[in-house]
Amino acid sequence: MIHTLETTVAGRKMKVDFGKTGMLSNAAIFMSYGDTVVMINANASKAPREGIDFFPLSVDYEERLYSVGKIPGGFIKREGKPSDKSILHARSIDRPLRPLFPKGYRNDVQIVNTVLSVEQDNLPEILAINGSSLALCLSSIPFTTPVAAVSVGLVDGEFIINPTVAQRENTILDLTVCATKERVMMVEAGGQEIDEETMYSAIMFGFQECKNIVAFQEEAVAKFGKTKNEPILYKADEEVEKEVKEFAFDMIKEVMYIMDKDERNAQLDKVKEKISEEFSEKYEDKKADIAEVIYKTQKEVVRNMLLNENRRPDGRSFDEVRPISCEVGILPRTHGTGLFTRGLTQVMTVATLGALGDVQILDGIAEEASKRYMHHYNFPSYSVGEVRPLRGPGRREIGHGALAERALEPLIPSEEEFPYTIRLVSEVLSSNGSTSQASVCGSTLALLDAGVPIKRPAAGIAMGLITSDDLEKEKVITDIQGIEDFFGDMDFKVAGTEKGITSIQFDTKIAGLSDNCVRDALEGAKKARLHILGKIKECIPEPRKELSKYAPRTEIICIDPEKIRDVIGAGGKIINKIIADTNVKIEIKEDGKIFVTSNNEPEGVKKAISIIEGLTKEVVQGEIYLGKVTKTTNFGAFVEILPGKEGLVHISKLDFARVEKVEDVVSVGDEILVKVTDIDNQGRINLSRKDAIAKKEEEKDK
């Protein structure tokens, strides 16, 4: 049986169709918003997965190019692996949903979002979050708390829910809010230095609209939702838990109060060995239960320390940032480097400048675009002292790279101000919490060292949270380290300048954040951010005046757009010859701006510009030019006076005396002075050598 339900969000129709497709899926829905359609399929394994200590949730976001009427490029002509954007959207769906599954649920759950139709005014990624929540709620999978999502823009001082393409072009805020009907679950934002109060108001504005979408989901569940399965929840054996806790609690507590991380970890390993010696024979088949009890005991001790004893594992106050050091210029041949250290977290970011032609072309379901500024993040195993194979970037690395990229994007100068492509690479050298925000700080240092005239320096910080089981008591923590992140309830990352916020990403491990918690986290992050910015400015107060001697050099010239064809030539013949002869890169814009770039050959840039100017320069009647003879005939000589522009010197105009043979006066390859005597209505240029000589003699006499 097919079930349909509709509602209105921001003046546009949102609709769900259930039972129409995917008859063998636990739940399959068509979710539409305007002409944007996403199909969501939710399924779960029948039994828990054995031998794991986590919830195996898998979220996929699949973009189909037919959704926008495109055929994939390349030889294969079909979609390949998910794009970085698809991976980011999948992570955005995962984060608000994961905390709302029952604790101890170990069944495999997969949510597949397939984008079928896209109207650019209505973002499919926002619809996919709503659809994933609704599909889970309609299924028999034990997920019962609906989550809604909206996009919030800020145009001319007004907040807008789910802004259209035209509105997104003018917004100074790009905010995604996910919430239940009671609390905010997840926020992602990019903004042009938004103040904390405005950001808080925007989040609350989005939260209110989320409540309406949650009500829509609840109505759908009440009308045609499936009966929920009784979940099988993992729980450590009660006898094992009791005995291990009695034996080890005091030892674990003593260890967790050690401030030094390395010493704490070393002592914890010894405690685990003692526990193993004590119980390995008695509970030989209960090793997973023993590990679970150790984890729960550590968590209990750390959370009690923070929540009830007002003490942090490393002894800092709750609003204190770890010791910071900043360095620049540490690599001799790169274009810019920044080494940022905060406690045991250390990131080195390297800036590389390239020609405008080095931009990354983005090909997907969105409108065609390119990226002139990009940030990549690498998290090798040695950063946490572990041994594992080095592979390509995973979802986490892609997500952290995008987050740091978004933090600095509003501060990057325009291509007119700084005509270069910019690539930043953040190498995590040591990780003990908030490496993504350390990457923001390292990136700022690298950009300043590279001489990039960013609007203002940016910095980032991660805020944490500890709450009581009933969520009544909560404490916000500044600059969380690894242990506080691992056992805490929130990771609230905020980056920005002294003027305002440029990016936010937060998610929780509990059923959402209170309004006060959001406000406190924003204010705490501002205080910490200003402190870090002070340290950055002490290291390098402004961008370097000169680029690295190893960086490319770019010059800009402007020509009449009508002359672009003269520079390119038939089939690109002329421009390719210029590039080959001068060893430069040339980028031509539709408005007539031409960017000429060379790595280490400034003379090549000058030569290329000279050629381009010659190609686009108009021949002026009455002017004298130094030209090169390209051809001789029995009636005269053809002379190139500007690149691609030739005129004829008639034999009678070659000399004052009578000339019997052209070759008696000039030969091919000779450079001679000529005067433009006439340009006829067909554009043919008539030249005179003797008039040029006469004029020069006249000027000499004066």
UniProtKB/Swiss-Prot annotation:
Places the protein is found: Cytoplasm
Transmembrane segments: none
Metal-binding recorded as keyword: yes
One Gene Ontology CC term in the entry: cytosol
Catalytic activity: RNA(n+1) + phosphate = RNA(n) + a ribonucleoside 5'-diphosphate
One GO MF term attached to the UniProt entry: RNA binding
Cofactor dependency: Mg(2+)
Enzyme Commission (EC) number: 2.7.7.8
KH domain residues: 552-612
GO biological process, one term: mRNA catabolic process
Protein name: Polyribonucleotide nucleotidyltransferase
Species: Clostridium botulinum (strain Kyoto / Type A2)
